[in-house]
Amino acid sequence: MPDGTRLAARLWLPVTDHPVPALLEHHPGGLGDTTAVRDAQRHPWYAGHGYASLRVDARGHGSSEGNPADPASPAGTDDGLALLDWLTARPWSNGRAGAFGIGRGGTAALALAARAPEALAAVVAVCADDRTAPRRDLAGAPLAAAVHGGSAARLAAACRPPDPRYTGDDWRRLWLERLAAVDPGADDEGGPIDLRTVRAAVLAFGGWADPQAGTVLRLVEELGPDARGVLGPWPHQYPDQGLPPGPAIGFLQETLRWWDHWLRGADTGVLKEPALRSWMNESVPPAPSYANRPGRWIGDDGWPSPDVREVHYGLDDALRTAGTPSGERFVPVRSPQHTGIDAGALRPAGGAADLPPDQREEDGRSVCFDSVPLPEPEELLGGPALRLRVRCDGRHGQVAARLCDVAPDGSSTLVARGAAALAGGTGPVEVEVELAPVAHAFPAGHRIRLALSSAYWPWLWPVAETGGFEVDPGGSVLTLPVRHLAADAGSGPVTFDPPEHAPVPAELHPEPLVSHPERQVVHDVAAGEWRLQLARPAGATVHPDGLAEEEHVLEAYRIRADDPLGARARTDRTLRLERTDIGWDVTLQLRSEASCDAGHLTVHDHLRALEGGDVIFERHWRRRLPRS
């Protein structure tokens, strides 16, 4: 880099005498371990189709030098510009380049495009974040699982050691410098990405099961005619991985059409595709995982789509709640603190228990407003919106809203959700709650349910008061984005090829000695406490280059049904990396704990780094964060 820092990279080149375009993936995952398999699937495939493909570990991550920096931060984007300049200055380059990535790598590609470098002609962003919404709260309501589990994961990723196979004997010095520089409280990501300055053509992929689905809709809406979006049923994964919920598609073939059009000038028909291609989820019985979600592909020529209209459901008319005296104007909402225990994962990644199970128990802890059985099917595409007239007598409050599909047998499948903070003591006020965007087909005979609760643990930190709030149904309305049932008439089918990948060297996965359920709920009846335990499937991986990796992750959340300030969160992560041929054996241990009081959240992180069983670095961090 211009400051002398060296970044670890791997370059795949096509066998040709002609200049070729280049592709850049700039990501914080280590290319020798964390992303080794998926890198081997796609970068050689792109090279085999005539592209120079470069995979780079972000500064301070993997085997790169320097202090940890998010690749989409201002400093990380500076590195991205330097990498782009290096690529396009190679003698084999035709001067045109594209950038791609998933998650933080996809966000880095968007941030790079916002700098408008001349050589960057196209971007493919998967499950990316345009950073229009804060990462630590949901409409002002502080997130618990996101702040705690997500921050612990980011801290662990930043603390992974360099690999001596690529850095030589310097690995220990680089690791100790990295550990000394890590700050779990730092937020180096930067602000929202300014989409107005993006000149590259953007193809965005996302999944309805991923919290960043809204980014795809915003990119299609704001970037104009050279942007395209694809939203499938997927979790936070590449669309060709086949992880639930599927079905998977030929992501590499689809992106090759994009690269060929913008980097080679070939007529591949990509601009003839609908601006937005979406998977319309069919109604299914609730389950924590679906191998393939039933549904169909649909196409819309723009976003907002002319085929989507707003339909309003008043909470005292089209939707009604049971058990409220007819003379009462306000309906009390006072949920037990463990409401939300069946929320599912905040960011599903294809696990066996990632999705929310049957919502009937959650509905019983909430106030529900139901429609009559639908006389005909109703398909939603976009973000539902909720306007509530509420009264909150406490100092603070929060509302969690869930949209559910209720089958004739009473089973309740979660469709969308959202939340907002409430300011108390001001009398009746109007509150806007944006629910996550969805594509869902309600069948005839099913009911639409809006469930309101005053707690949603562990997604949201509980407020100190337990009084909840009151809602005025007559002043409240749910607005649904309803797509015309005949919108597909006369349109050609939306199709994708099946997945293709480059051949991948074999990894070894020895059977784990101990395993834990991926998601386990325990109710201690005598203590009145609810505990949620999340475990990543344990085990070891031996990578093709001989690196042995073993990681164990256990998250635990607990709360009492009547004690909001007793909420506790804890994550334990252990990572061991070993190269037996050179006698290299290191372990990283991280414990992160979080608690709350009426005005603050307290987070304690404890990190230990070991070499050959001996502790070579240990550090504690304690942060006290105001709830606001």
Regions of interest found by a model, annotated:
Residues 15-88, 138, 395-401, 407-409, ...:
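Cap/lid segment of the alpha/beta-hydrolase catalytic domain
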Residues 39-40, 48, 114-116, 120-197:
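Accessory cap/linker subdomain of secreted extracellular hydrolases
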Residues 1-17, 370, 374-376:
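N-terminal cap/lid segment of alpha/beta-hydrolase-fold proteins
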Residues 173-227, 231:
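Serine-hydrolase catalytic core
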Residues 99-101, 126, 205:
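Short beta-strand immediately N-terminal to the catalytic nucleophile in serine-hydrolase-like folds
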Residues 230, 238-239, 244-610, 614-628:
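C-terminal, loop-rich substrate-recognition/catalytic regions characterized by aromatic stacking residues
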Residues 101-111:
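Glycine-rich nucleophile elbow surrounding the catalytic serine of serine-hydrolase chemistry
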Residues 92-103:
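Alpha/beta-hydrolase fold nucleophile elbow
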